[in-house]
From Swiss-Prot:
Signal peptide: none annotated. The gene is RPS1. Belongs to the eukaryotic ribosomal protein eS1 family. Its main location: cytoplasm. Coiled coil: none annotated. One of its GO terms (cellular component) is cytosolic small ribosomal subunit. The keyword S-adenosyl-L-methionine does not apply. InterPro entries: Ribosomal_eS1 (IPR001593), Ribosomal_eS1_CS (IPR018281), Ribosomal_eS1_euk (IPR027500). The lineage of its organism: Eukaryota, Fungi, Dikarya, Ascomycota, Saccharomycotina. It comes from Kluyveromyces lactis (strain ATCC 8585 / CBS 2359 / DSM 70799 / NBRC 1267 / NRRL Y-1140 / WM37). This is Small ribosomal subunit protein eS1. One of its GO terms (molecular function) is structural constituent of ribosome.
Length: 255
């Protein structure tokens, strides 16, 4: 073999080790702040590349969506099965001001609620809040035994399901239309709407495990910095938000 064709021989002593640069030296940390609707406002930290030339770090941060467990935001394990999405809307120094972007249930919680000998009822509505946020809200409910019932099953008839679904849709539409996004979030945390649905449908068929299982943000109004700052407090320096009063779930008879 010719020497000129052998890459190992022709390389010589040129191959020096390249200087290894830590990629984290080009990045910086930002603190994520939740709205004052939640009790704990410190969500966590996020990384972003430092501002270089015309490329600004804040442009990469705005619109970023983070998913947080509601138990961490409220400091209570009672909300461990619910996930909240927060969207970064504004950058103030090293703080990222977020707004509510959606809510969902964990998969294990949804699977654990489905049992035999009962009927699953689902309903969803697309409605606009009083401050022009368009939301799609999904509700879920399960039938339970009536008082002094001997029969093992608690299946609802199709007519009952239609009536219950209609009542759920009416309550969800009314509650959302008469509330701002912040007010609606305050209702979703202690599950006030769930109890209202359960009481409104008890004459049709008794229900259990009534939940708003998902809230999806479809459309948002034009960004208003003033409303965002008021949502976080004027100075946005408080580490604690206002506490939302909750309640204890009633112990229902298992089926």
């Amino acid at each position: 073999m010719a020497v000129g064709k052998n890459k190992r021989l022709s390389k010589g002593k040129k191959g020096l080790k390249k200087r290894v640069v830590d990629p984290f030296t080009r990045k910086e940390w930002y603190d994520i702040k939740a709205p004052s609707t939640f009790e704990n406002r410190n969500v966590g930290k996020t990384l972003v590349n430092k501002s270089v030339g015309l490329k600004n770090a804040s442009d990469s941060l705005k619109g970023r969506v983070v998913e947080v467990c509601l138990a961490d935001l409220q400091g209570s394990e009672d909300h461990s099965f619910r996930k909240v999405k927060l969207r970064v809307d504004e950058v103030q120094g090293k703080n990222l001001l977020t707004n509510f972007h959606g809510m969902d249930f964990t998969t294990d919680k949804l699977r654990s609620m489905v049992r035999k000998w009962q009927t699953l009822i689902e309903a969803n509505v697309t409605v606009k809040t009083s401050d022009d946020y368009v939301l799609r809200i999904f509700a879920i409910a399960f039938t339970r035994k009536q008082a002094n019932q001997v029969k093992r099953t608690s299946y609802a008839q199709s007519s009952h399901i239609r009536q219950i679904r209609k009542v759920i849709s009416e309550i969800l539409t009314r509650e959302v239309q008469n509330s701002t996004l912040a007010q609606l979030t305050s209702k979703l945390i202690p599950e006030v709407i769930n109890k209202e649905i359960e009481n409104a449908t008890k004459d049709i068929f008794p229900l259990q495990n009534v939940h708003i299982r998902k809230v999806k943000l479809l459309k948002q109004p034009k960004f208003d910095l003033g409303s965002l700052l008021s949502l976080h407090g004027e100075a946005s320096a408080e580490e604690k938000g206002k506490k939302v009063a909750g309640f204890k779930d009633e112990i229902l008879e298992t089926v």
